Amino acid sequence: MDNNNDLHYCSFCNKAQDEVDKLITNSSDGLKVFICNECIELSHKAISQKKDRSFNSDRISDMKLLLKKPEDIKNFLSKHVVGQKHAQHVLSVAMYNHCQSMVQFHAISDIEIEKSNIMLIGPTGSGKTLLAKTLAKVSDVPFAMADATTLTEAGYVGDDVESVLSRLLQAANYDVVKAQRGIVFIDEIDKITRKSEGTSITRDVSGEGVQQALLKIMEGTVAYVPPQGGRKHPQQEFIQVDTSNILFICGGAFEGLDKIIEARKKGTSVGFGADISQSKEQKKKNALHDVQPEDLIKFGLIPEFVGRVPITAVLDELDHEDLIHVLTEPRNALIKQYKALLAFSKVNLEFSDEAISAIAKKAISYKTGARMLRAILESLLLDIMYTSGNGGFEGSTIVITKKMVELGKATVNHNNNGNVITVND
């Protein structure tokens, strides 16, 4: 009996310490609480099962993309993005596979499907950012964007890489589960390449060091994220974010990459196979579509980083016809936007076909793709929007002409009969 009094029992299952492998107690000097190894294992299983059920339930209810096929994704992209059919094709398959891998993340315990991050290569204004944003929209997931040139290693002035995840948390209204299914777009990734292929013996604040820092969150880890953006608020509590299912899309123009590709392929198109009729622009376009991981490494991305971005999509430079489509065709086409703005002031805004063509031609002269279209329209319509905003032109129709575009300013007025006339046409 005395021996029995010395026995300790599990406070949960009431088994004696000699009936279990291990009995653990709290370190408090007050009331002693004991738990055996069997109860610990049961508790762990119960928590895991509950977590898995809620995780899968969230996916079913929140991720609308799970019901979409690659064709559906591509159709959605094509409604918002002009051209870039190949890139849309690549992204639709990549996003479909990514979402399917998240479904299997808990469903299949013995198979782990690694995520495939994406690299978008294309000139300025070709639609890299728009594609990434639209992909997040069709996926119904939070989206965050960062400029790689503003990121620095820990210990240096600037934004640390965790600030990217902080923006994603904000986009998800601090819903961690939702943020962990989001999309992060890192632009200007080509600007943080190391200066040479050899290993640097000095600190590289905005190059290889940032690639190494990004690599950690891109490959999947539990990051400790400051909700307000790290270094400016060092005393705040950190939020744990698992990046395993966050899709990272990197984008860059990669000027000069075509020359690296051509150097690698040198000699393969000599003789009867050589096409000497191709223009310089066509040769560059064709070269980029043949990009290989070794070319990106030669450009200055570290091998480990390239390995974590296995999917590459090349975007072509937008030509005159493409820019006309950008102005008129997408659901949120720029001309549709400005017509809607003027409609609020009861003004009917119209553009002649020649005017639209002239706007596209002017944008091409700036060599920044579609980015200059809005600036051109803002300058062109400035006086009209000012006057209409003050009650002028109400009930009138204003037609933008080619000459207005060439002059860069559409000045209109009323004649004595109250009709709208064009002063500079």
UniProtKB/Swiss-Prot annotation:
Keywords: ATP-binding, Chaperone, Metal-binding, Nucleotide-binding, Zinc
PROSITE patterns, A to Z: CLPX_ZB (PS51902)
Gene Ontology biological process terms in this record: cell division; proteolysis involved in protein catabolic process
Keyword Cell membrane set for record: no
Residues annotated to bind ATP: 123-130
InterPro entries for this protein: AAA+_ATPase, ATP-dep_Clp_protease_ClpX, ATPase_AAA_core, Clp_ATPase_C, Clp_protease_ATP-bd_su_ClpX, ClpX_bact, P-loop_NTPase, Znf_CppX_C4
Zinc among keywords: yes
Assembly, per entry: Component of the ClpX-ClpP complex. Forms a hexameric ring that, in the presence of ATP, binds to fourteen ClpP subunits assembled into a disk-like structure with a central cavity, resembling the structure of eukaryotic proteasomes.
Name this protein carries in UniProt: ATP-dependent Clp protease ATP-binding subunit ClpX
Source organism phylogeny: Bacteria, Pseudomonadati, Pseudomonadota, Alphaproteobacteria, Rickettsiales
